[in-house]
Design a protein with these regions (language model features):
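Short, polar loop motifs at secondary-structure junctions
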Residues: 44-49
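Sec-dependent N-terminal signal peptides
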Residues: 4-15
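Rhodanese-like catalytic fold shared by cysteine-dependent sulfurtransferases
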Residues: 16-27, 35, 39, 51-88, ...
Length: 137
């Protein structure tokens, strides 16, 4: 019984670590735009969705859902910009869920410091400030 409890505790510790991520609320990000704070916005939406709406200055990667090796490699085009800066990195996906977490984990694995990474809470679908959205590429 003791061995089972230790195993369960170890599994829970691993699960909580892999699910941890830093989030940024839409209002906080809006204020950063207003204050013209520098940041790197990595948008993983599919190309069609990105063309319909995205945040200004976003780097289009079309990496969603960032599950496969090919999808994750699409994030590589952001690495030179990210590593050449100390700015925060905001990951934007359709809903701020698994695709964003997959991207977050991939960027971590590529040496991006966790304290720089943020996921837009609720993704572009939850972004309430439509006046800050851009259309087209």
């Amino acid at each position: 019984m003791k061995r089972i409890l230790v195993t369960i505790a170890a599994l829970l510790a691993c699960a909580s670590t892999s699910q941890a991520a830093n989030y940024i609320e839409a209002e906080v990000l809006k204020q950063a735009f207003i204050q013209k704070k520098t940041m790197i916005v990595v948008d993983i939406q599919p190309a069609k969705d990105f063309a319909q709406q995205h945040l200004p200055g976003s780097i289009e990667t079309n990496a969603f859902p960032a599950k496969t090796t090919d999808e994750k490699r699409r994030l590589d085009r952001t690495l030179a910009t990210i590593k050449g800066s100390t700015d925060p990195v905001i990951i934007v996906c359709p809903r701020g869920k698994s695709g964003a977490k997959n991207s977050y984990e991939y960027l971590l694995s590529q040496g991006v410091a966790e304290e720089r990474l943020r996921i837009l809470e609720d993704g572009i679908a939850g972004w309430p400030f439509k006046e800050y959205l851009t259309q087209g590429k």
